[in-house]
Amino acid sequence: HWLVLNDLASPTQKMDVEDLLDMLKWPETVAINEPPPGPVLAKDPDALRVIAKAMDSGKIYSGHAPKLPDKILQSYASTGASSDHESTESGEAWSKLTYGIKVMMRQGSASPDMEELVKLAIKHPAASRHMMLVADEIDPVDLTERGHIDATVKRAIELGLDPIVAYQMVTLNA
């Protein structure tokens, strides 16, 4: 089963494959986000069917590939994932970029990975066109004290990222 948050006020519900395929027909559906890597890599027919339908429908397929060994990451990339927000170190992010997966550099209360990954964008400016600055799981206290994506952009610039590139990463690249 896949978990879908269908409304901010609703609890998480289990959805079956047919539900997901129906939801992909909705004009409001713009993406399939973070399909579990286990079924995808195991070539589960249902998982691959949902991904294929999403891609055939012009929807974005955003991946979820934390710390996969290189050969497994190659297989995962071949399923068509356009992006991933699970990189925690530069080497992992570089591998994803090499295999055509855009890297989301997340900055949040639970996952402050951007500070490590921004070094990669500074070192390889051409790769920065395939990288995004994103917010992820920001604690309400952090949100009120530091801000949202604006704080992430500001911090990336403080770390040495060109300001134009930083704003590109939250607009054009996103």
Predicted features and spans:
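Active-site-adjacent beta->alpha loops and helix N-cap segments on the catalytic face
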Residues: 40-51, 69-72, 93-95, 112-116, ...
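His/Asp/Glu-enriched, well-ordered alpha-helical/loop segment
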Residues: 121-174
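Glycine-enriched alpha-helix->loop->beta-strand junction motifs that scaffold or abut catalytic
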Residues: 28-29, 58, 75-83, 98-104, ...
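Active-site-proximal loop/turn and secondary-structure-junction residues that shape catalytic pockets
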Residues: 1-3, 36-38, 65-69, 89, ...
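Conserved, mostly hydrophobic/aromatic
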Residues: 32, 96, 166
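Hydrophobic faces of well-ordered beta-strands that scaffold small-molecule active sites
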Residues: 1, 30-34, 61-63, 83-85, ...
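Divalent-metal coordination cores built from histidine and acidic residues
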Residues: 1-58
